[in-house]
A protein has these predicted regions:
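N-terminal ordered "arm"
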Residues: 1-3
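A glycine-rich, hydrophobic loop/mini-helix early in the fold
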Residues: 6-28
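A short linear-motif detector with a strong N-terminal bias
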Residues: 8-12, 87, 120-121
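Ordered, amphipathic secondary-structure segments that act as subunit-interaction surfaces
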Residues: 25-63
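Short, hydrophobic/proline-enriched secondary-structure or compact coil segments at domain edges
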Residues: 31-32, 81-92
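Surface-exposed flexible segments
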Residues: 42-53, 92-110
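Short glycine-rich, low-complexity/disordered patches
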Residues: 55-81
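Extended, charged low-complexity segments
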Residues: 98-164
Length: 164
């Protein structure tokens, strides 16, 4: 729920370019919201990630120097123990497979590390078979194969508490 609007089952993805140190901000981005979102759901998700509702997402929003567009798109993503896939229409495609121990049984993770992308959650160390972005109208175009990748499970939840 965002401001009384149920956004269950919907996705938000940002495709962005970071010009230097990630914490210095000035990111250039195009944001994508699930194409099946109603207008109210779209607006609620946009408002949250634009920082208009405060909280940790407002801190994140401060890092974006320019959001060039916010678009509806078909978004498909799945992550299972470090193996991940992301598709956004025909403009973004990426897949990654986690590194494993020599016997192949244990997935390589980083915990409580500077390289963990989400504190308290394991970072899955992986190799991306491919990562392609084709957004020429925004000068966001690249295609990589066989590069390193890290991902984490991430959930944010806010529960309003009654003030006595």
């Amino acid at each position: 729920m965002i401001g009384g609007v149920d956004v269950s089952g919907l996705s938000f993805v940002t495709v962005h370019q970071v010009p230097g140190n990630i914490l210095q901000g000035d990111w250039r981005a195009v944001w994508f919201i699930s194409e099946e979102a109603s207008d109210d759901q779209f607006d609620a998700i946009h408002d949250a990630f634009a920082g208009r509702l405060g909280g940790p997402l407002a801190d994140l929003a401060d890092l974006f120097g320019e959001v060039m567009d916010v678009k509806r798109a078909p978004i498909t993503h799945a992550t299972v123990q470090g193996k991940g896939r992301l598709l956004i229409g025909d403009v973004v495609s990426g897949e990654m497979e986690p590194y494993r121990s020599p016997d192949g049984q244990t997935i390589t993770t980083l915990r409580d590390s500077l390289f963990s992308t989400v504190p308290g959650s394991p970072a899955y160390v992986a190799k991306a078979s491919h990562n392609r972005v084709d957004l020429p109208d925004y000068d966001l175009v690249w295609s990589f194969e066989g590069r390193n990748a890290i991902q984490s499970d991430w959930t944010i939840e806010h529960r309003a508490e009654a003030v006595a």
